Amino acid sequence: MNRRKNLKVSIVMGSQSDFKTMKLAKEILLKLKVPCEVKIISAHRTPKRMYEYALKAEKNNIGVIIAGAGGSAHLPGMVAALTQIPVLGVPIESKKLKGLDSLLSIAQMPKGIPVGTLAVGEDGAINAALLAASIIANNNLLIKSKLKNWRASQTCLLYTSPSPRD
C-alpha cells in the first residue's frame, strides 16, 4: 500500500453563505495544525468545476473532503461519486426546513457511494473537522498528539466549569 504523506483536508461548500457554518470546521482544523483549504464549489451552478475538483483531489494531496451543502445538498454525494477519498457531508441549516432537507439528501445515498453524514449546522461542521483530523491522524503523529490534547482539554473544561446545581 502506498501511503500518502502530508495529506490535507479540503472544505468545500455550495455557496458563500455556507461559510458562516463551515468556517467552524476550518477553525478546528487550524487549531489542530491540520493543513486545509477552503473552496466554493456548487454542484448546480459550477458542475464542471465540481467534477474537475473531485477528479483531481487525490493528485492534489487531499486526504479527506468536508462538503457542506444546504437545500437539495447534492455536493457531498456528487463529490463522493467521483473520488475514492472519504467525504464527510455537513447539512447546512436552512430557513425553510431547518436543514432537514439537506440532512436527508446527504444521508440517503445509494449503496456503494458512501458519505459520512454529520449533524445539521455548526455542530456538524465542528464534528466533521474532528473526524477529518482523526482520519488524517492515522498517518500523522503530530496531528494525533494535537487531537489527543484537544480532547483532553474538552474534558478539563467540563470538570472546571461551574456546576449548575451550585
What are these regions (language model features)?
Residues 9-37, 42-43:
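Glycine-rich phosphate/diphosphate-binding loop of Rossmann-like nucleotide-binding domains
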Residues 18-22, 47, 72-78, 97-100, ...:
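Short glycine/serine/threonine-rich phosphate/pyrophosphate-binding segments
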Residues 41-58:
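N-terminal beta-loop-helix "entrance" segment that forms/cooperates
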Residues 53-91, 95:
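Glycine-rich phosphate-binding loop
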Residues 121-155:
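A charged, well-structured terminal subsegment
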Residues 159-166:
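Conserved small/polar residues in nucleotide/adenosyl-binding loops
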